[in-house]
Curated annotation (Swiss-Prot):
Subunit structure: Tetramer of two alpha and two beta subunits.
Signal sequence bounds: none
Active site residues according to the UniProt entry: Y123
Protein's name in the database: Ribonucleoside-diphosphate reductase subunit beta
UniProt similarity note: Belongs to the ribonucleoside diphosphate reductase small chain family.
Length: 376
């Protein structure tokens, strides 16, 4: 069935599945099939921030004084994060919105994707401040072999889903040849592609940022590149929310409470999902090798980062019902939690940009029952 921006068929959105039902018509939020997505939207909106709010002028001085191997670590991570958020700033909208059937999930995907564009703008804000010619950095992203190796794994799941869902929308089920490749398109094969695409996105949000995050926070622990670390802290807070969103979608699918066929597909794809996560973890270990090829930094080295990748991979895989692949069970860099959990840090508002400040998070609804325990 071809995608329509406004279906005129009246339907009960509470009875629609998350995906592959009737396209959303009225964007209504007085009722939700899954209230979690509404809460995620509200939380993301309360997080709203702009990179220009953070003063990164001291970072230019700090960066100039770094030894060459630490400059390599810092700038390489920014390149890699730019790649990840370039993909995430457009792909969820392009791939998922034509398939969504409930308004709260549709709006969550749009809200999520918009926040990713802020992340991309942040990297430009940081890079523009520390180097004289930012284009040298950005131009290297699409030619850097280490970065491109990761880009293919990340983008292929999106690309396959987008291609086949467009074929399905235009022509229905069948076998088609696109760019010399034979594509067998069925509704079930699309559901499988969707599940694996979401699992790939989950791995991206769950693992792929965290080597870079750890390095940024390790610099800040030494009172270096602190403006960058404040921005990365905002980004990490957003990414944790996006991770919660994909975990929730995947767990609903696996439980079969939304679409019984998705539960079958989740079971059928368990090994592929496991392999996908482990491959992402191994790539991040290889990224740590690349970062530290010329030397370590104070408080962080290749071996510590490898242990951290294994630790965090176990946690993320357990959250979506997958077996644990690694022996590492304890966090080798516990100090990172002070950066990843915004409530852990108390600061004076006049001294720094306050990353724990939220907007519109007071519940102003009052019911007569709220006064039942009052006595005069």
């Amino acid at each position: 069935m071809a995608y329509t921006t406004f279906s005129q068929n009246k339907n009960d959105q509470l009875k629609e599945p998350m995906f592959f039902g009737q396209n959303v018509n009225v964007a209504r939020y007085d009722q939700q099939k899954y209230e979690t997505f509404e809460k995620l939207i509200e939380k993301q909106l309360s997080f709203f921030w702009r990179p220009e709010e953070v003063d990164v002028s001291q970072d230019r001085i700090d960066y100039a004084a770094l030894p060459e191997h630490e400059k390599h670590i810092f700038i390489s991570n920014l390149k890699y994060q730019t790649l990840l958020d370039s993909i995430q700033g457009r792909s969820p909208n392009v791939a998922l919105l034509p398939l969504v059937s409930i308004p709260e999930l549709e709006t969550w995907i749009e809200t999520w994707t918009f926040s990713e564009t802020i992340h991309s703008r942040s990297y430009t804000h940081i890079i523009r401040n520390i180097v004289n010619d930012p284009s040298i950095v950005f131009d290297d992203i699409v030619t850097n072999e280490e970065i491109i190796k990761r880009a293919q794994d990340i983008s292929s799941y999106y690309d396959d889903l987008i291609r086949d869902s467009q074929l399905y929308g235009l022509y229905g089920e069948g076998t088609y040849t696109v760019d010399g490749k034979e594509c067998v398109v069925t509704l079930r094969s699309l559901k499988k592609q969707l599940y694996l695409c979401l699992m790939s996105v989950n791995a991206l949000e769950a693992i792929r940022f965290y080597v870079s995050f750890a390095c940024s926070f390790a610099f800040a622990e030494r009172r270096l590149m602190e403006g960058n670390a404040k921005i990365i802290k905002f980004i990490a807070r957003d990414e944790a929310l996006h991770l919660t969103g994909t975990q929730h979608i995947l767990n609903i699918m696996a439980a079969g409470q939304d679409d019984p066929e998705m539960a079958e597909i989740a079971e059928e794809c368990k090994q592929e999902a496991y392999d996908l996560f482990v491959a992402a973890a191994e790539q991040e270990k290889a990224w740590a090798d690349y970062l530290f090829k010329d030397g370590s930094m104070i408080g962080l080295n290749r071996d510590i980062l490898v242990q951290y990748v294994e630790y965090i991979t176990n946690i993320r895989m357990q959250a979506v019902g997958l077996p644990l692949p690694f022996q590492t069970r304890s966090n080798p860099i516990p100090w990172i939690n002070a950066w990843l959990v915004s409530d852990n840090v108390q600061v004076a508002p006049q001294e720094v940009e306050v990353s724990s400040y939220l907007v519109g998070q007071i519940d102003s609804k009052v019911d007569t029952n709220d006064f039942d325990d009052f006595s005069l």
